[in-house]
A protein has these predicted regions:
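A beta-strand signature from Gram-negative outer-membrane beta-barrel systems
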Residues: 139-183
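Flexible loop and strand-edge segments within Gram-negative outer membrane beta-barrel domains
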Residues: 218-222, 238, 257-329, 359-360
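Gram-negative outer-membrane beta-barrel transporters
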Residues: 261, 379-386, 498, 502-505, ...
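Membrane-embedded beta-barrel scaffold of Gram-negative outer-membrane proteins
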Residues: 214, 300-314, 342, 352-355, ...
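Extracytoplasmic beta-strand/coil segments of soluble accessory domains associated
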Residues: 49, 56, 82-127, 146
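Periplasmic-side early beta-strands and strand-to-turn transitions of outer-membrane beta-barrels
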Residues: 157, 169, 176-179, 183-187, ...
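Structural signature of Gram-negative outer-membrane beta-barrels, strongest in the C-terminal barrel
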Residues: 254-256, 262-263, 267, 289-294, ...
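Short acidic/polar hinge/loop motifs at secondary-structure boundaries
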Residues: 124-152, 469
């Protein structure tokens, strides 16, 4: 049953919204008044994720949220993106272990969220071999983040396959924008949390650079009780340890062109949850990348390589998953302005080659894909904007080309005013992963037979049985169509309002299902009891595979509010409503159900050296059915979290205390996930701006 948001939470919401107003009443010195005059207003917010080139947010006919670098700096999040991105409307976020985070736009997420593309400065970190994102492998330092852009809705017409339900683009500051800068940061706290980071940037004539290193570790959250009759060994849940190194060097050839080179390394370990059950990623698992860019005006040519090397052990069965993958991508893009700015044409393409060594999919050793796209932003009138685009992709794993169009229109009903009504339709796709196509392994599961003791006269204990899991090379791509109507307004540059209503349908869903069960006439290997007993037990899977099936229809609404109540101080609130999905040719019991209601409210900023943030997040219960069989399916309770930051900044040094889930409400964000509680950490930092800016 869906419950109302508690009155106490609403009281806290009002308190959070009203508190910053007191700051606005403090008399300001000349310096603060100048800062307020220079502070960027909401109508000046620029994004790049909507069309792969810089646009004012007010000119984008799709739903995009922007998390600013200032908000990131003040947030309670120290080591995971879940606490940070949960405040975005329309984005369902789950944390299932100390290191495992998943998120999906405008539909239920899962243990392996496959439909949301995640990038760092336009470089994908999506793992094509399994179709998921390892968030902790983003090799970026908090101090170098410029902003995070979250586009909700199909983005394949711009970014290609796997941007099916949306895009998260983590954008970092360039070395030249950072200038000559040094930062050192360290902290420690509850749940065995400790972290250290260092960042150095500099500018030397035509050269600019930045280098960073970091280390983060945390003990495990508690595992849930043995609710399913299957073993959940506690000893292997070791938390996580994550070293990171990253670097970038730019060379300014002339005013219009430059070269940029980057590379990084990230290590990880800890629990990752999949449809095959939880795996423990071993020590020494790592990801690395290298990138080279040439920019000339609006033209860009890029090459990047992502390398992943990891080993893992399934916690429910003796299944080893070792994966060594390489992604090699070459892309080019350009932009042309025509008819005195009425048409802005954006076009380009890419070719990608993947190599894989997968212990559970030995036949999926290589894959290639390529695509081209064309976008046109047409402004026939100063109050009317049309965006249309199309992309064509080919995959070595899919017969025929994949066509993804989109179109959007935006009207500003009042000349000279920042009010915009938008209507858009778009299509997104997700290509089958290598595992979807080529999985070939046995999963050893277990069933607790001890309830049969009174009948049998002895305790049969746990019975282990094999399930053969097999891929399907004939899978088609998933297709996601979405229609959206929305409204965006900026009032006096200081207040931003946003509304969106959408309906969507995902067809040819890639579903991992059981197509054969053991029976009394075909019992599992090693079954020593009478065969008829199987008729009184939960059905035991014999064979599992993937299929394209049916459709899932979603609809929902999002409301957003932001306001700058004083220089550097902001309050926000947003609400998300998602209707339970409607399904065809699929049993609703086999579909994850997202929370119906989600609500976020918060504030963040700094006043006379005092830095703070406070965010309350509420969400309803959710249903999960994406892991193995019905023994691992169930409902997670509604939850309310309060995250707080309080600190003080001097000229070159700062101290802060950052707390997540302050009230220590114990909850699971997925039915098989860890039990998440409170974490409080203390942090100290040194910052040196050698340019005295």
């Amino acid at each position: 049953m869906r419950r109302m948001i508690p009155i106490t939470i609403m009281t806290l919401v009002l308190s959070l919204l009203l508190t910053p107003l007191a700051f606005a009443a403090i008399p300001q010195g000349q310096e603060e008044q100048e800062e307020q005059e220079q502070e960027q207003s909401y109508e000046e917010t620029v994004v790049v994720s909507a069309s792969r080139f810089e646009q004012l947010l007010m000119d984008v006919p799709v739903s995009i949220s922007v998390i600013t670098g200032e908000f990131i700096k003040n947030s309670a999040s120290t080591g995971n993106y879940a606490d940070l991105l949960r405040s975005v409307p329309g984005l369902n976020v789950t944390q299932t272990s100390a290191r495992d985070t998943n998120m999906t736009s405008r539909q239920a997420t899962s243990t392996l969220a496959t439909s949301q593309l995640v990038m760092v400065d336009g470089r994908t970190v999506y793992q094509d071999f399994f179709g998921f994102v390892l968030w902790e492998l983003l090799p970026v330092n908090r101090d170098e983040l410029a902003q995070i852009e979250v586009q909700r809705g199909p983005s394949s017409a711009v970014w290609g396959a796997n941007a099916m339900t949306g895009v998260v683009n983590v954008i970092t500051k360039s070395p030249r924008a950072m200038g000559n800068w040094t930062s050192i940061r360290a902290g420690a706290g509850e749940i065995g949390t400790s972290f250290f980071s260092a960042l150095q940037s500099g500018v030397r004539d035509k050269f600019s650079y930045k280098f960073s290193g970091a280390y983060y570790q945390q003990d495990p959250w508690p595992r849930p009780s043995n609710f399913s009759g299957a073993a959940f060994p506690d000893a292997v849940n070791r938390g996580t340890a994550q070293p990171k190194f990253d670097g970038r060097v730019d060379y300014q050839i002339n005013q219009d062109s430059n070269l940029s080179f980057g590379g990084g390394y990230t290590g990880t370990n800890g629990i990752i949850f999949t449809g095959l059950g939880p795996f423990d990623i071993a020590d020494g698992s790592s990801a690395s990348y290298m990138r080279a860019d040439y920019n000339n005006g609006d033209a860009n040519v890029r090459f990047f390589a992502n390398i992943l090397d990891a080993e893992s052990q399934n916690l429910l069965s003796p299944l080893i998953l070792n994966f060594a993958t390489g992604t090699y991508d070459f892309s080019a893009k350009n932009m042309t302005v025509a008819q005195e700015g009425k048409h802005v044409l954006n076009y380009g393409g890419n070719y990608r080659h993947l190599t894989n060594e997968l212990s559970i999919a030995p036949d999926g050793d290589t894959r290639s894909e390529g695509g081209v796209y064309l976008q046109d932003n047409w402004a026939p009138h100063e109050q009317f904007l049309i965006n249309a685009g199309v992309r064509l992709d080919t995959f070595s794993s899919i017969d025929g080309a994949v066509f993804t169009p989109r179109i959007g229109m935006q009207v500003r009903p009042f000349a000279g005013e920042d009010h915009a009504i938008r209507v858009s339709w778009g299509r997104g796709t997700r290509a089958p992963s290598v595992i979807n196509n080529h999985l070939n392994t046995f999963i050893f599961n277990s069933l607790d037979l001890s309830p049969l003791t009174p009948v049998l006269g002895f305790n049969p204990g746990l019975f282990a049985f094999p399930i053969f899991a097999e891929g399907n090379p004939g899978l088609k791509q998933e297709t996601h169509d979405q229609f959206e109507v929305g409204y965006r307004a900026v009032i006096n540059g200081k207040v931003s309002l946003d509304f969106a209503y959408y309906v969507s349908e995902t067809t040819d869903n890639i579903d991992f299902y059981t197509d054969q069960y053991f029976t009394m006439f075909d019992p599992p290997p090693g079954w020593a009891l009478p065969g008829f007993i199987l008729n009184f037990l939960p059905a035991l899977p014999k064979h599992m595979t993937y299929r394209n099936i049916g459709s899932i229809k979603n609809q929902g609404m999002e409301l957003g509010f932001q306001a700058r109540v004083a220089p550097g101080n902001e309050i926000f609130a947003n609400y998300t409503w998602q209707k339970d999905p409607e399904v065809e040719e699929i049993d609703l019991a086999d579909v994850n159900l997202p929370p119906t209601n989600r609500f976020n409210v918060g504030m963040a900023g700094s006043v006379r050296g005092l830095m703070y943030s406070a965010v309350v997040a509420y969400q309803d219960e959710a249903f999960w059915s994406d892991v193995l069989d019905s023994r691992f399916h169930g409902v997670t309770d509604k939850m309310t979290t309060l995250n707080l930051t309080l600190g003080y900044e001097l000229e070159n040094i700062n101290f802060s205390v950052r707390a997540t889930n302050v009230t220590n409400q114990l909850f699971q964000q997925h039915y098989v996930g860890d039990v998440i509680g409170r974490r409080v950490v203390a942090e100290a930092g040194l910052n040196f701006d050698w340019d005295n800016r």
